[in-house]
Amino acid sequence: MLCPSCGHDNLEGMDRCDNCMKSLRDLDVPRADATGGVVRSVMEDDLSRLEQEETVIVRPGDSALGVAQSMKESRKGCALVLDDAGKLVGIFTEHDVMKKLISAGESVRDVPVDQLMTRNPEALRETDSVAAALNKMAMGRYRHVPIAKDDGRYVVASITSVLRYIAQEDW
């Protein structure tokens, strides 16, 4: 890599020029063009472009411990809590397991998930942009955002699914 300051030919990946010690950081990192590439796709592509896997669906009275076990078995980071009418009333996440369920102590087997879940999470629509999901995750410090599908079902956009979407695209 040529140093833009002195012209010295440095090894690829060097942080500083061996000759003049100027920073070479970020010189070989591709930049996103605000009018194309990853930025445009994240801003314009809707959430239907993300990998959509079925999620764990539970009822408010289900045992929080049982829900956590279902999440572990299915390798999911959250469970959506739906009432009998199929309305989203909560989300129960790995964070809830670590912070709330564990602190429930000996009575953990008796705690219903609706006492520990995050109530009334706002679900995005499939037609919302990937950027909308990223914004919700960043602002709320969430790793999972519910998505309401047109057919009435729910799926989850996770930070992992967003990163996979970005990584798989041919920019």
Describe the role of every protein-language-model region:
Residues 1-171:
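Tandem CBS (Cystathionine beta-synthase) repeat/Bateman regulatory domains
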